[in-house]
């Protein structure tokens, strides 16, 4: 059912090179399964691949079984949008339920990390376990795919056997931070059609085509939480243990609702302020004392208690799968959309690294990922174990 429509896009023609007949013929031998989320990025990705001559089919993944509050998880609406786009593009849409895999390999880890006082990033684990493992294996083994494709804003360079992962061209939308666990082999089996263009161009192509997703709002947050309050959601699965809020000097200034609800560097939602004998500078979460169930806060954004000179990271993944065994100069992000931090990686062993920043950094958070770059290339990363003060 490849490209049975006569759809065209002037915006596409302006931003993508015209392929030779030989290249189109070569691509026509390859089958690509696009992960269709019901959003604009995957919709346009499918169209781009059709224009490049590939045999294109879509696959919609359901990764969460809705609870009784179906307003929060929009799987049914997203499926309807994905189907409408598939119909418009004249391509087949497969459906698969990965909810069991998601629960076992992503959600249970998410809960365990929060229970241990860390702040995990389930999007990274979802990409690792679902989109580039369960989906990739299903597409290759059951659907006969040569490649999968997603709407991620990243780029790949090099041949299939030695593919490198690069930042997306649109620096505001770059998602390489979430894909650092991929191996060069997985990158080589994947295509990222929108990684070489900017988001406004993606929307313009969708507008040209009259796609139902053209003006659809980007999804925010995690499907299983959606737009609901995070605290209410987490309380359904983990019992909260309220406790004291203390300053770094040990003064009790309030009560917290449970350490799992707070993250390092957090300012809002602490419920403290205007304390007698203290200045008006806001408080920030500096530390979580798990042993005593105490939330430790520091006053002022530039308070030294909030700063780290480096970090220790484990659970390492390098895109080329070669461990780093010598000190390496590069840059690092310790959270999404952060400006790159110049640093040095100092390997401790193949499973552990020490990272020293050129300048102290605020809110380095255990459980989050440290992702490393040299220029445009994403080297890989690891999970932050501890700060180095």
UniProtKB/Swiss-Prot annotation:
One of its GO terms (cellular component) is cytoplasm. It comes from the Bacteria. Residues 121-123 are annotated as: Interaction with target base in tRNA. It catalyses: S-sulfanyl-L-cysteinyl-[protein] + uridine(34) in tRNA + AH2 + ATP = 2-thiouridine(34) in tRNA + L-cysteinyl-[protein] + A + AMP + diphosphate + H(+). Its EC number is 2.8.1.13. Coiled coil: none annotated. GO terms for molecular function: ATP binding; tRNA binding; tRNA-uridine 2-sulfurtransferase activity. This is tRNA-specific 2-thiouridylase MnmA. It comes from Mannheimia succiniciproducens (strain KCTC 0769BP / MBEL55E).
